[in-house]
Amino acid sequence: MRYEELDEACRSLEHLASDAEAEGEDAPLIPDPPGAVSPPTSLSGKAVLQVILLCASATLTLDIGLTVVRAPKIRLFESILCQAYYRTHGNPLPVPMQNIPESQCKTKEIQSGVARLIGWQTVFDGIPAIFLAIPYGALSDSKGRRPVLLLCFLGLALSTAWALLVCWMQWPLELTWISSLFQCLGGGPAVATAVLEATIADVVPDDKRSTIYFQLQATVLISDILANPLSSVLMAHNAWTPCFLGVGIQALATVLLIALPETLDFAKGSRPSDASIYGCKEEEPTLRGCLAKNFRSIVSDRNVAGLVFSLLILTVSAESLDFLLQYVSQRYGWSIAQSAMLLSLRAVVEFGLLLVVGSLLLFTQSSGLRNPRQRDLLIARLSLGLIVAGLLILSLSPTVAPAILVYTLGAGFQPAIMSLLASLWKASNPSNLGSLYSTVAIILAVGGVISGPLISLMYRIGLSLGHGWVGLPYFVASGLCAGIAGVLLSVKLPEQEQKPRRRET
């Protein structure tokens, strides 16, 4: 069944390519929304397809490399802290670090130490994006998307390699936090995501963008479907094997980006001649001035501001899920390898969901039943409700499967929000889409810097209280997401866009 779904997704991409080739021959039956900016019609359909497939392939490869390393790295943290804990308490374990039984490492002191490492790593990982997202966004708007993506991918690979080197040498685990310095190359995952989304927005029209975002997110989920079982199998032999494999795969992802066409030239046809590389006039060329201008542009549009602020839900939910392997292992008595398999099952459900939703988007697009912006807003609101419910159930449920299922059903939130945000922004700011996404990356990084230590603290408090209190971080995350949800509910599209439109026959 999985191969049939992938084949269907590929046919959808081919359909997009044929549509792009035909744009110059047939006028659209429905005009674009007022002020909307579409990519130049001179861009061939094959080039569009090449950009989409290479973005998906490179991102998928990178995510596989990162995912393969995730579970064994936590296991290495546990083993090192476990060995130090028993040695400190006068009862050193008579086995090498890699052979320490996992059951010996579930004390609250050891688990609190692991949570502290993860929580503060989130803080340090967010700092490069906060200070470098705008400069790299400006670079992507002037020199191109591909150079920035190459730096991002290289920085992430080096960051992973440093953390594993610290574990291999058995240096103090706090030195793993230095891995964030390598993310100054490119700005880290937040900037990589922003530039990838800007790359897609360069070449994909407004009415097709959310469909492609859904299909790309579904494709990337293959990393969880494939990498977690692979990691679990390899961990049964040795925790180091999947770690070395993961670094190699991340390096391969960086090499794949060399073949990515530069999309900035395709988008320049829609740029006003008096705009500078990141939407700032010549009299306001400084980084501070450009950052202030981007924030003013966001705040001046109530809808854009509401969408950007609602993206903080992603940081809260993502940081809480960073503890999922540790949480499931601690609360439900699973091994780290078994917990990683649970993430694969979650990815299978999310993969199917995104393909189904993507197919529905293609149907509404072809039938003209719903305006793309109204459709994206509806999907975002429904997905948000499922995220809040899933986190709440995860904090209270005696079994993990129902909570993961409900949470996963909210997977459409990010692609719907980003598609709607790009559409609204390009209607009035066509010249600096990369800087918009970079500004969003800064906001998300700040959210991660705040929510990461908060979720870590809640988890450690839950561990100290014992029993059902270990679910405290997910209860808090659910409440925070519910509060942010009110902002998304306040977003109102212009009156003329709220009426569904049909194609004339």
Swiss-Prot record:
Q: Which InterPro entries match?
A: MFS (IPR011701), MFS_dom (IPR020846), MFS_trans_sf (IPR036259)
Q: Where in the cell is it found?
A: Membrane
CDD domains for the chain: MFS (cd06174)
- Tell me if Transmembrane helix is a UniProt keyword of this record: yes
Annotated pathway: Secondary metabolite biosynthesis
Single annotated GO MF: transmembrane transporter activity
Q: How does the record classify its membrane topology?
A: Multi-pass membrane protein
Show the stretches that span the lipid bilayer: 48-68, 117-137, 148-168, 181-201, 216-236, 240-260, 304-324, 343-363, 377-399, 403-425, 439-459, 469-489
Q: Which domain of life is it from?
A: Eukaryota
Induction record: Expression is positively regulated by the aspercryptin cluser-specific transcription factor atnN.
Q: What is its main location?
A: membrane
Q: Does the keyword Transmembrane helix apply?
A: yes
Which Pfam families does its entry note?
A: MFS_1
Keyword terms, alphabetized: Membrane, Transmembrane, Transmembrane helix, Transport
Record-stated family: Belongs to the major facilitator superfamily.
Name used for this protein in its record: MFS efflux pump atnC
Q: What is the organism field in this record? A: Emericella nidulans (strain FGSC A4 / ATCC 38163 / CBS 112.46 / NRRL 194 / M139) (Aspergillus nidulans)
